[in-house]
């Protein structure tokens, strides 16, 4: 299964078919044991990061994607590299709270969808958060290690593993 993130949003059905993956909508809802669970990339919960929201709106538009994919591979690689550099520089200048989820948005999401558990990434600050509205598990980033949530009827355990 696959949920688009902020760097792999151009992966489409051809990629999914070749990789034997199913692309899930964001958010994706499921029931597991007695829990109603939502899976999300997580960036939609970072509502204070206005520059990122504007960037996402632009690059997810059909017009931008068609123009980008119409360029040569060499040009696309250069553009992508530049975009990563600009993003990294921008993030270095942002207050950490701007790039994190907002509590109000999280609470509204829990209440609107009546979920028990939200699992997301994007912020790359792995932790389990327990609030009055429900439990939120943040998965870490994937470099030399990966992250998962081990879930059964008795417990939830956030685990890091070597790739």
Residue ranges and their predicted role:
Residues 13, 65, 71, 88, ...:
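Residue-identity detector for glutamine
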Residues 18-26, 36-38, 43, 49-54, ...:
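Conserved beta-sheet core of the metallophosphoesterase superfamily
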Residues 31-36, 67-74, 149-152:
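Short C-terminal domain-edge/linker segments immediately following a structured domain
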Residues 1-32, 144:
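Core catalytic region of metal-dependent phosphoesterases/phosphodiesterases
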Residues 40-101:
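Active-site-proximal loop/helix segment associated with metal-binding centers of metalloenzymes
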């Amino acid at each position: 299964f696959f949920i688009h993130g902020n760097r792999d949003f151009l992966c489409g059905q051809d990629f999914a078919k070749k990789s034997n993956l199913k692309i899930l909508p964001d958010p994706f809802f499921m029931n597991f044991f007695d829990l109603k669970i939502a899976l999300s990339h997580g960036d939609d919960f970072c509502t204070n990061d206005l520059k990122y929201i504007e960037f996402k709106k632009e690059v997810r538009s059909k017009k931008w994607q068609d123009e980008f994919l119409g360029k040569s591979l060499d040009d696309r690689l250069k553009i992508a590299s530049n975009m990563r550099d600009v993003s990294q520089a921008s993030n270095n200048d942002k207050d950490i709270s701007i790039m994190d989820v907002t509590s109000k948005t999280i609470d509204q999401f829990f209440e609107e969808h009546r979920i028990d558990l939200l699992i997301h990434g994007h912020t790359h600050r792995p932790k389990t958060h327990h609030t009055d509205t429900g439990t939120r598990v943040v998965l870490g980033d994937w470099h030399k290690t990966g992250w998962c949530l081990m879930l059964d009827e008795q417990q939830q355990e956030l685990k890091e593993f070597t790739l």
